[in-house]
Swiss-Prot record:
InterPro entries (UniProt xref): NA-bd_OB-fold (IPR012340), Rib_uL2_dom2 (IPR014722), Ribosomal_uL2 (IPR002171), Ribosomal_uL2_bac/org-type (IPR005880), Ribosomal_uL2_C (IPR022669), Ribosomal_uL2_CS (IPR022671), Ribosomal_uL2_dom3 (IPR014726), Ribosomal_uL2_RNA-bd_dom (IPR022666)
Start and end residues of each stretch annotated as Disordered: 1-21, 225-274
GO biological process: mitochondrial translation
Protein name per its UniProtKB record: Large ribosomal subunit protein uL2cz/uL2cy
Highest taxon of source: Eukaryota
Primary location: plastid
Originating species: Gossypium barbadense (Sea Island cotton)
SS bond list: none
HAMAP family: Ribosomal_uL2_B
Lineage: Eukaryota, Viridiplantae, Streptophyta, Embryophyta, Tracheophyta
Keyword NAD: no
Keyword Oxidoreductase assigned: no
Location of this chain's protein in the cell: Plastid, Chloroplast
Length: 274
């Protein structure tokens, strides 16, 4: 990814750094409008997800997470920006005339050929079952349930590793550090998701953040006691507690947030590292 650094001509462009190469040119048959009316609210209008609101209108791109065009070669025609995710997407022309979007694998360029199936080469961008991959393969867009499409390792720069195969299961190390079991019949895409340098971008001003639909984040220590457990006091007062708390009074910073007694507890060999 090419990072474009702004010249300091105005305060808004000072220290700004954005991607200057990838553009957006969505295809009409692969997009549809989405009604984003919630802005972090539930059906009663109460905020359930803070710091969301505003933002530019978006068209949703239909991404092919299943990769079910088996044994049909496709060519990368364009690499495009997707406002609904931080990874780029590729526009693919298949040999049978089908046209689809997929996640952009790192290093893929326009003109590359990809294919999905059971007996395809271990090449960046190809999709195949885990049982046909050698150990140590870097993968992304991993299925959890057979035929449901990729659900793991889909963010920009995400990559998992196939570390073992035994019986009907394969052992994967996920980007979070979690080690878990997945059926060997599930499919995944070879390689790493592109746009690795997404964290190097600097928006430069608050208005650019608002375009993304992200509202300002206010510290609890500067609020009133009615708004946050850390609020109140005279001047720059500490939080007044032994341990930090969430706005609803629950323990923060270290408390486990995973739901208990989930079906997948037996599939997780090592919990994620923080």
């Amino acid at each position: 990814m090419a990072i474009h650094l702004y010249k300091t001509s105005t305060p808004g462009t000072r220290n700004g750094a954005v991607d200057s190469q990838v553009k957006s040119n969505p295809r009409n048959n692969l997009i549809y409008g989405q009604h984003r009316c919630g802005k972090g609210r539930n059906a009663r209008g109460i905020i359930t997800a803070r710091h969301r609101g505003g933002g530019h209108k978006r068209l949703y791109r239909k991404i092919d997470f299943r990769r079910n065009e088996k044994d049909i070669y496709g060519r990368i025609v364009t690499i495009e920006y997707d406002p609904n995710r931080n990874a780029y997407i590729c526009f693919i022309h298949y040999g049978d005339g089908e046209k689809r979007y997929i996640l952009h694998p790192r290093g893929a360029i326009i003109g590359d050929i990809i294919v999905s199936g059971t007996e395809v080469p271990i090449k960046m961008g190809n999709a195949l079952p885990l049982t046909d991959m050698p150990l140590g393969t870097a993968i992304h867009n991993i299925e959890i349930t057979l035929g449901r499409g990729g659900q793991l390792a889909r963010a920009a720069g995400a990559v998992a590793k196939l570390i073992a195969k035994e019986g009907k299961s394969a052992t994967l190390k996920l980007p979070s550090g979690e080690v878990r079991l997945i059926s060997k019949n599930c499919s995944a895409t070879v390689g790493q998701v592109g746009n690795v340098g997404v964290n190097q971008k600097s928006l430069g001003r608050a208005g650019s953040k608002c375009w993304l639909g992200k509202r300002p984040v206010v510290r609890g220590v500067v609020m009133n006691p009615v708004d946050h457990p850390h609020g109140g006091g005279e001047g720059r007062a500490p939080i007044g507690r032994k341990k930090p708390a969430t706005p609803w009074g629950h323990p923060a910073l270290g408390r486990r947030s995973r739901k208990r007694n989930k079906y997948s507890d037996n599939l997780i060999l090592r919990r994620r590292s923080k």
